[in-house]
């Protein structure tokens, strides 16, 4: 069956006023459409055709004769369907019986107790437990069932289980309206070590970070705000792409603009390339600050040339990347840099709604001996107030005190303002999102539920991308491209592999190299892979011990090779696996029906003689009468005398029954076949 539209079986059954089970039987017996369960999706054309046929039947005076067939033996199998259609035509006269057969739609969260499910199903608890026992699940009345178990159980009672989000969470934090008021930009400074990131931050702040911290006057809260010609800019003063990517890996996009610092006398260096790749992966606008222009060896043109090698074309070279020559030492160019930040922010049209409840991200967090859990927050929308109840990741609390970046005690903080707060129950993680909720009880309940979900997730397998599971994820629409990080021992290998991998891209599967560099596989690489759901490929290099531990923790797939072509073959094989498989039919054999047996508890058994090939238990079969295929299905049982048989060869007799088909006649030919997948040999 081709899935072209989202018409589910249970939805169509409701429209036709019949149960899902009856519709599934009708689809199989009358339309030759096989579906797995009530949640299966029907082709739009099939659904419309079925509706038209049902409408025609109800409007026809000959409806009663439609299901009449020549043989009395299949009357019983069709009687239920006919009776149901007659009841529909009569307008459901027997309302009491119909109400028990009506399909029930049940909403549940991740788990539900046996008693709660029984109440929703309107069935005795003992009956539900009995069905669970038939399913091989031994459960007490107060035991919790997961979603999959509850779904299968509900199907037996003609009910549909729908998963829902927590109502409280939905009501409290679902509002994603960005608002209409302008907000300050949030800026992160990135670049290679010793290129002057901290010096630029210090120069902008008009004071040395070390001197102010030593006196305990200024609180280091991980961010600060400056005023530029009446406009505010918030800088995250934890420079480096590690913090930037760690937050992004947690789903927190806090940065609006990135300042990429490049030393004029040093040029593009390995960590600069990493920073560039992080920015591209996060799709954050970038301003290049070419620092140390006061040095004698400064060469602006060389830096710009190296930028173009990474597809960053400066504006004065005809591109769209803003480059600003600066000197943190002499303060030259810093005003221009700040103006460019304001200009870029205006182009980005950064908006917020100060009137809504606050939400944002944790920048830093620690446990203070005297003050307890302390968290630095960046308010991204709304206004945060002292006394607000908040949910922060898996923890919660009520804000007892709030301080700005200068250590001043404040009562309120608007969008893009960094603050330090007291009052949380535990220390959150950097990158955790926070939301203000109506009261502390709500926050505590939400935190408890999040912790429970986290425990469940830890028990489940990881969902990071590996070459083995890419095909399944692409089929489910989870992965639309394969992101790769390449590390090698020499630059020539890196470039060769990147070019080769990018050439593998097709219309069906895209390969995107998000980072390539020389050196061992580091924790930074693993963090980027976790944030971008990427695979790491290494050539003649190994991951460090810390990187190995982190990769295992984050579920990042790391592959190392000695030969480049082995890696290309593996990537290509994974991509080939993503292509839609093709199938060919292989006929296994055929058998002639010599005698037909009717068994009330089983159905129709065909006594057959295998004419050629073989009949196997797991094969599909088609029933052929007078050269015409009248039905296709699976073998429900295959016996040789009284014993179950896996297969029966040519020249032997057997007994078999066909799934959902009882109209077998003497002289019919049973043809067994399988569908074999033809694996694509190339892209």
UniProtKB/Swiss-Prot annotation:
Cellular component terms (Gene Ontology): cytosol
Main location: cytoplasm
Sequence positions that bind GTP: 191-198, 237-241, 291-294
Disulphide connectivity of cysteines: none
Annotated segments matching region G5: 327-329
Region described as G4: spans on this chain: 291-294
Function according to Swiss-Prot or TrEMBL: One of the essential components for the initiation of protein synthesis. Protects formylmethionyl-tRNA from spontaneous hydrolysis and promotes its binding to the 30S ribosomal subunits. Also involved in the hydrolysis of GTP during the formation of the 70S ribosomal complex.
Protein's name in the database: Translation initiation factor IF-2
Organism encoding this protein: Clostridium novyi (strain NT)
């Amino acid at each position: 069956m081709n899935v072209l539209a989202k018409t589910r079986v249970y939805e169509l059954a409701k429209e036709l006023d019949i149960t899902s089970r009856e519709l599934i039987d009708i689809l199989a017996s009358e339309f030759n459409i096989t579906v797995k369960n009530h949640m299966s999706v029907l082709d739009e054309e099939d659904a419309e055709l079925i509706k038209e046929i049902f409408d025609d039947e109800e409007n026809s005076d000959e409806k009663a004769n439609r299901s009449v067939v020549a043989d009395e033996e299949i009357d019983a199998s069709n009687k239920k369907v006919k009776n149901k259609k007659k009841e529909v035509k009569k307008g459901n006269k027997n309302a009491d019986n119909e109400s028990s057969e009506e399909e029930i739609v049940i909403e549940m969260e991740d788990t539900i107790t046996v008693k709660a499910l029984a109440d929703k199903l309107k069935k005795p608890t003992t009956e539900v437990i009995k069905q669970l026992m038939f399913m091989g699940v031994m459960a007490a009345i107060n035991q919790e069932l997961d979603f999959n178990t509850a779904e299968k159980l509900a199907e037996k009672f003609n009910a549909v289980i729908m998963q829902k989000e927590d109502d409280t969470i939905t009501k409290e934090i679902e509002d994603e309206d960005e608002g209409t008021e302008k907000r300050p930009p949030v800026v992160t400074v990135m670049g290679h070590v010793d290129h002057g990131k901290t010096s630029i931050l210090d120069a902008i702040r008009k004071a040395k970070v070390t001197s102010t911290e030593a006196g305990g006057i200024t609180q280091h809260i991980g961010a600060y705000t400056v005023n530029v010609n009446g406009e505010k800019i918030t800088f995250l003063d934890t420079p480096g792409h590690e913090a930037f990517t760690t937050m992004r890996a947690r789903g927190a996009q806090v940065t609006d603009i990135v300042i990429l610092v490049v030393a004029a006398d040093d040029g593009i260096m390995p960590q600069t390339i990493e920073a560039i790749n992080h920015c591209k992966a996060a799709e954050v606008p970038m301003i290049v600050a070419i620092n140390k222009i006061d040095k004698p060896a400064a060469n602006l043109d060389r830096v710009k040339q190296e930028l173009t090698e990474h597809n960053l074309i400066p504006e004065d070279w005809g591109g769209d990347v803003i480059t600003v020559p600066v000197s943190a030492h002499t303060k030259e160019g810093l005003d221009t840099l700040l103006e460019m930040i304001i200009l870029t922010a205006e182009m980005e049209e950064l908006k917020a709604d100060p009137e809504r409840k606050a939400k944002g991200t944790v920048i830093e967090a620690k446990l203070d001996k005297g003050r307890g859990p302390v968290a630095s927050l960046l308010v991204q929308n709304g206004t945060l107030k002292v006394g607000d109840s908040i949910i922060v990741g898996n923890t919660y609390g009520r804000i007892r005190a709030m301080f700005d970046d200068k250590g001043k005690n404040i009562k309120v903080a608007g969008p893009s303002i960094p603050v330090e707060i007291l009052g949380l129950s535990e220390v959150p993680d950097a990158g955790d999102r926070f939301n203000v909720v109506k009261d502390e009880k709500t926050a505590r309940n939400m935190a408890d539920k999040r912790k429970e979900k986290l425990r469940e997730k830890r028990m489940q397998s990881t969902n990071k991308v590996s070459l083995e599971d890419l095909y399944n994820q692409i089929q489910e629409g989870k992965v639309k491209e394969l992101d790769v990080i390449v590390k090698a021992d020499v630059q020539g290998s890196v470039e060769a592999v990147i070019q080769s991998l990018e050439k593998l891209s097709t219309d069906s599967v895209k390969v995107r190299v998000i980072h390539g560099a020389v050196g061992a596989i580091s924790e930074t690489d693993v963090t980027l892979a976790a944030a971008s759901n990427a695979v790491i490929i290494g050539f003649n290099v190994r991951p460090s011990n810390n990187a190995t531990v982190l990769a295992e923790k984050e579920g990042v797939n790391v592959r190392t090779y000695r030969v480049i072509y082995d890696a290309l073959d593996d990537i290509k094989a994974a991509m080939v696996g993503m292509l839609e498989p093709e199938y060919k039919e292989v006929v296994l054999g055929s058998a002639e029906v010599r005698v037909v047996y009717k068994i009330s508890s089983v159905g129709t058994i065909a006594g057959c003689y295998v004419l050629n090939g073989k009949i196997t238990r797991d094969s599909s079969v088609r029933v052929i009468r007078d050269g015409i295929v009248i039905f296709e299905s699976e073998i429900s049982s295959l016996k040789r005398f009284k014993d179950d048989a896996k297969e029966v060869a040519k020249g032997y007799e057997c007994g078999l029954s066909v799934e959902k088909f009882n109209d077998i006649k003497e002289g019919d030919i049973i043809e067994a076949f399988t569908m074999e997948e033809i694996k694509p040999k190339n892209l």
